[in-house]
């Protein structure tokens, strides 16, 4: 049965003028009638499924640097959560999955960015980042809050809710 299904799928997706030949010992291939339930017309008429309704919602953490900082953070209409981190920092690796979850949970309500302090030291020094991880909240291009260290998700959600509630 599994082999027959495999051949059905192969026959359905094989190019019409394919010169490829399937060499199988003394195996009996399915008849044309066995291929009938898998009509190509029925498969091709399926309507597309929309997974995400909002094209502008970003559900992942965006990498910010000196080049795109103004466009991503300063000009953003929604509140922006920015994590300052470095690849060698253990606590930064601990908080990274939390920031990823927040980006998914608050997609369309906030923008989550991360800045590698090794790659963008000028951005970090502009905002007085001396310890990492540091999370800053921006709203309307203005720094509103900062949290230093690897904090629990609940701390960050409370902070985010404070700023998306006052939009």
Curated annotation (Swiss-Prot):
Localization, UniProt: Plastid, Chloroplast
Domain of life, source organism: Eukaryota
Disulfide bonds: 89-92
Entry keywords, A to Z: Chloroplast, Disulfide bond, Electron transport, Plastid, Redox-active center, Transit peptide, Transport
InterPro entries tied to this protein: Thioredoxin, Thioredoxin-like_sf, Thioredoxin_CS, Thioredoxin_domain
Transit peptide: 1-53
Domain Thioredoxin: 54-165
One of the record's GO molecular function terms: protein-disulfide reductase activity
GO cellular component, one term: cytoplasm
Pfam families per the UniProt record, alphabetical: Thioredoxin (PF00085)
Description of how the protein assembles with itself and partners: Forms a complex with heterodimeric ferredoxin-thioredoxin reductase (FTR) and ferredoxin.
Family from the record: Belongs to the thioredoxin family. Plant M-type subfamily.
Chain's role: Participates in various redox reactions through the reversible oxidation of the active center dithiol to a disulfide. The M form is known to activate NADP-malate dehydrogenase.
Protein name stated in the entry: Thioredoxin M-type, chloroplastic
């Amino acid at each position: 049965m599994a082999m027959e299904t495999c051949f059905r799928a192969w026959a359905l997706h094989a190019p019409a003028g394919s010169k490829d030949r399937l060499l199988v010992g003394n195996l009996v291939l399915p008849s044309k009638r066995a291929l009938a339930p898998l009509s190509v017309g029925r498969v091709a008429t399926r309507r597309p499924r929309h997974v995400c309704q909002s094209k502008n919602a970003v559900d992942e953490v965006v990498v910010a640097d000196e080049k795109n900082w103004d466009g991503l953070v300063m000009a953003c209409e929604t509140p922006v959560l920015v994590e300052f981190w470095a690849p060698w920092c253990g606590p930064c690796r601990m908080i990274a999955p939390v920031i990823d979850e927040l980006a998914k949970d608050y997609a369309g309500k906030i923008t989550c960015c991360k800045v590698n302090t090794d790659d963008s030291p000028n951005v970090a020094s502009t905002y007085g980042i001396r310890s990492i991880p540091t999370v800053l909240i921006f709203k309307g291009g203005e720094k509103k809050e900062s949290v230093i260290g690897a904090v629990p998700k609940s701390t960050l959600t409370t902070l985010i809710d404070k700023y998306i509630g006052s939009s």
